Amino acid sequence: MRVVLRGGDVIAKKATIIAVTNQKGGVGKSTTCENLGIGLAMEGKKVLLVDTDPQGSLTISMGWKQPDELNTTLSTLMQKAMSDQPIQPGEGVLHHAEGVDLIPANIELAGLEEALVNSMNREKMLKQVLDGAKREYDYILLDCMPSLGMLTVNALAAADSTLIPMQTQYLSAKGLEQLLQTVQKVRRQINPKLKIEGILLTMTDSRTTYGKQIDNLIRQGYGRKINVFEQTIPRSVRAAEISAAGKSIFAYDPKG
């Protein structure tokens, strides 16, 4: 995206990069990433989604059901970055019917994570991939894998901020501290500007006493130092249906 001043000078406007992160699986990272991105696109923003999970959960939920058959994925682009090969504008980008773009992922990314361990500048390979795209989008959302490995560190190193979807369950609350320690370490050693957007409580069930207790525990334990969004994502059987349909909640159930 470009901003033109009165004198004719052009200033490149860089995208805001948000890593959707939690080392626990099944907390709604991919669903959050997809629907947040499409929601922003509906408001006129240009959005790129990046699947950084070798399982390809985001890629599959957006309608590409066989990610292992895709010729160009995030793994392809990161391999180019590691070997100092140029990445062409728009290379590997897929276009979704609901107005967002996607850099997909597949199982090849698992092998690349192992290769990153021995790579120079290993924490910043994803940042190199995204450097060109930052001028083309308003937002870049990174769907992170359920671990705190090198790919997640790459996402945090490239991001301006991180959004943490989190189930209202005891084990999720226990695992949050480990994630926050990783964020602090990345902030100290690699990306001092990294911020925490907040915790988004997902799969909530306000009908149960247990769900309410965990909700209160998270808000009381972390609410003073981290934003815990008032808006929560309730548990719904529709979530699986929406992912299978390859659509967002906006297209699947436009009447809400």
Where are these regions (language model features)?
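P-loop NTP-binding core
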Residues: 1-256
